[in-house]
């Protein structure tokens, strides 16, 4: 009975850090996405205001692909 409790406790303690680490990674990705949404076209160094499109060499924007 005692060994069963020790095994169960060990499994729970091993699982806790793994799930907590995964949540931390998700939170960092969410924060990065929120920061990227805050950048306007005026602050983006790749954005060309005349063409109203980006100037990246490899761009999949609709204005770059069509024109």
Swiss-Prot record:
Location within or outside the cell: Secreted
GO-annotated cellular components: extracellular region
Main localization of the protein described in the UniProt heading: secreted
Pfam family, one: Conotoxin
Tissues in which the UniProt entry reports expression: Expressed by the venom duct.
Keywords: Cleavage on pair of basic residues, Disulfide bond, Neurotoxin, Secreted, Signal, Toxin
Residue span(s) of the pro-peptide: 21-52
Transmembrane segments: none
Disulfide bond annotation, renumbered to this chain: 53-63, 54-61, 59-64
Signal peptide region: 1-20
A GO term, aspect molecular function: toxin activity
Main function: Probable neurotoxin.
Family: Belongs to the conotoxin M superfamily.
Comment block on domains: The cysteine framework is III (CC-C-C-CC). Classified in the M-1 branch, since 1 residue stands between the fourth and the fifth cysteine residues.
Name by which UniProt lists this protein: Conotoxin Im3.1
């Amino acid at each position: 009975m005692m060994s069963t409790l020790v095994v169960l406790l060990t499994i729970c303690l091993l699982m806790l850090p793994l799930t907590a680490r995964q949540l931390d990674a998700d939170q960092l990705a969410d924060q990065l996405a929120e920061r990227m949404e805050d950048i306007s076209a005026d602050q983006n160094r790749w954005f060309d205001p005349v063409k109203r499109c980006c100037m990246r060499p490899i761009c999949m924007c609709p204005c770059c692909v069509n024109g």
